[in-house]
């Protein structure tokens, strides 16, 4: 029991930091947007950012617990109406542990063009021909049926564009789900820049694309980028003594020559 409590506290810290990271990278939208993580000892339930607050305002005390029916089973604050994005993706994909939904502005703008995301920059290669677009509605996902539709659209992928709405990303860890959200927004932003300049004339392809994808999708990057952005947030906000900041000074050096 003590081990489970410690593990849940660690997940709460990561969830808090995920909200801080997403906001610091301009994926906050006032009190919209949410991130979740499955409870390892109870896979039918997950921790979730509550409604009515910003992503960066999560604390140990206000995070809520929700089941796969979308019902709040723990916590005092209200749950988001779009809970079904998370409950249905986690129900459909037992391999996934974390889900992010934001109204990432460049991704929303890009989704309105009806164009394919192509490998203009390093990040975009990850999504090339691997980025489904959910177009059943551009409205909020406030029913189980709509949530199931998002989960079907996601399929075996790790990201989906919600047309004229936002993004959904998912991963085996919080760090991975956040990293994919950051990569997708950056890829959309860079392609929009190319479109504004007349459209991309050159993109990565063939062996170059394969090598870039292999390097850009290493698990150590999920951890190192997440930890870096947490440290940056803590420095910028004078929170060096915050317990949520303390554990992010370790780097994963497994992919580098010593």
Residue ranges and their predicted role:
Residues 1-258:
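Glycine-rich flexible loops
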